[in-house]
Structures are given as C-alpha cells and as structure tokens.
C-alpha cells in the first residue's frame, strides 16, 4: 500500500471551534435586529442557550417563539442572511495551527468543508487558511447535493492534488457524515475528538467508522507512520 502523501482536513470543529463562529453570528444578529429582539447582549445570550438544546437547527424561530413574537418568514430569512454573511472573529485550535505548520511541505494539504460558500470562505479568510492548503473545496460550490457524505468533493480534491486514493488521509470530527466517502474510496480516515465539538457524540452510519481516532492533531504523525 502506498504511503500517505496527502492529508485532507475538514474545517468546522476540526481546525477551529465551530461554537466561535456560531456565537459571533448570534452577536451580529442580535445587534442588527435589536429593534425586534431588545438588548443585544441578552438576545445573543438567549441564542447561545438555545444552541445547546434541541432547537439548534432553528435557533431564530425558537427565539421568536420564546419572546411571543410571530413566526415571520421574512424576518427569520433576514436573520439567517445576517448570520451567514457576518465576518467572524475566530481562531484555530492551537494543535491545528501547529499541525498545519508542521505538515506543510511534508504532505500535500487539502481542505473540504460543507456549508454556504459565503460563510465557509469567510471562515477560511478569517483563519488565513488560503495559503496553508494546496487545494480547498467548499462542497456547496459543486452543487446542492454534493455535501458530505457525497464522494464528489473527495474525488475532485485527490485529482487537484495529483494523488491516488490510497495516498490520501482524511481528518474530520463528525462520524455521522465525514468518513463514509473516504472509507469507500480507500483513504485512511482519522477522527479528531474535540471535547467541545458539536458532533462529538454523533453515531457513524454503516461504512462510516473512522480507521483511527485521536484526541489532538499532535498525534497525527504517529498515526500516519503506522499506515
């Protein structure tokens, strides 16, 4: 089996804490819509609280309901737009920053991330990642059905990096979707378990169990030396 020559990373909760982005977005929404939501600090705090409940997929709708406000599709759409287009202040996990510095030049590096393109590129730019990867793919730019676990982004990034599937390793955090495609393609798969990760306890579907699990990216070199 060929040695790994390319490492492809997930972004959210793999390289930086996704909560940082979400909480930045809630603050932006709270400020812009203070006429409807009241005190921005209180409103942002309410959204942060709802984020850690079953209301996470519909925080804005739940917030309006808590306040006894009508479920205005127009208002919610504007809140979502503000959230997705805000310019975040976010930071890499220290081990991610160190790993990228250590691996750059030793391996070809790629990034695959799901989500609205405008949001994901804003994150990438806030983290100054464009020059730290040899190839970056935002799956929503490939088509509406190309998010993980669809294999298209994985196949494309291997082509762009000029490597064969057995030479690829993929590092992600979410077993519910991250590892199905790279497992099927014959990649080495590694889950990073972030204790503050949103999807830490997600269950892997059939074919989606990662080959390796680590608690810090400092352990990645040791894993790859065993492949």
Where are the language model's segments positioned?
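Class I S-adenosyl-L-methionine
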Residues: 27-34, 61, 65, 84, ...
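Short alpha-helix boundary/capping motifs
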Residues: 54, 90-93, 114-117, 148, ...
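Generic enzyme active-site microenvironment
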Residues: 8-10, 112, 171-172
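N-terminal helical cap/lid subdomain that shapes the substrate entry/recognition surface
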Residues: 2-94
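Alpha-helical elements of Rossmann-like donor-binding domains used by nucleotide-donor carbohydrate transfer enzymes
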Residues: 24, 28, 46, 59-62, ...
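Asp-based, Mg2+/Mn2+-dependent phosphohydrolase catalytic module
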Residues: 1-4, 101, 108, 117, ...
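Short, acidic loop-to-helix structural element flanking the phosphoryl-transfer center
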Residues: 81-111, 118
């Amino acid at each position: 089996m060929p040695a790994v020559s390319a490492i492809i990373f997930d972004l959210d909760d793999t390289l930086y804490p996704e909560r940082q982005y979400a909480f930045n977005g809630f603050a932006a929404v709270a400020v812009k819509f203070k006429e409807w939501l009241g005190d921005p600090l209180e409103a942002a705090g309410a959204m942060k609280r709802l984020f850690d409940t079953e209301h996470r997929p519909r925080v804005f709708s739940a917030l309006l309901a808590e306040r006894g406000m009508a479920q205005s599709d127009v208002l919610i759409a504007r809140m979502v737009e503000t959230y997705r287009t805000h310019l975040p202040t976010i930071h890499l996990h220290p081990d991610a920053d160190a790993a990228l510095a250590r691996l750059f030049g030793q391996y070809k590096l790629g990034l695959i991330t799901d989500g609205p393109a405008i949001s994901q590129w804003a994150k990438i730019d806030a983290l100054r990642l464009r020059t730290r990867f040899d190839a970056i793919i935002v799956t929503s730019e490939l088509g509406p059905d190309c998010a993980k676990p669809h294999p298209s982004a994985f196949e494309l990034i291997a082509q762009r990096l000029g490597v064969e599937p057995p030479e690829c390793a993929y590092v992600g955090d979410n077993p519910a979707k991250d590892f199905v495609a790279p497992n099927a393609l014959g990649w080495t798969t590694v889950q990073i378990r972030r204790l503050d990760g949103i999807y830490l306890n997600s269950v892997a579907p059939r074919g989606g169990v990662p080959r390796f699990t680590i608690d810090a990216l400092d352990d990645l070199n040791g894993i790859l030396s065993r492949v």
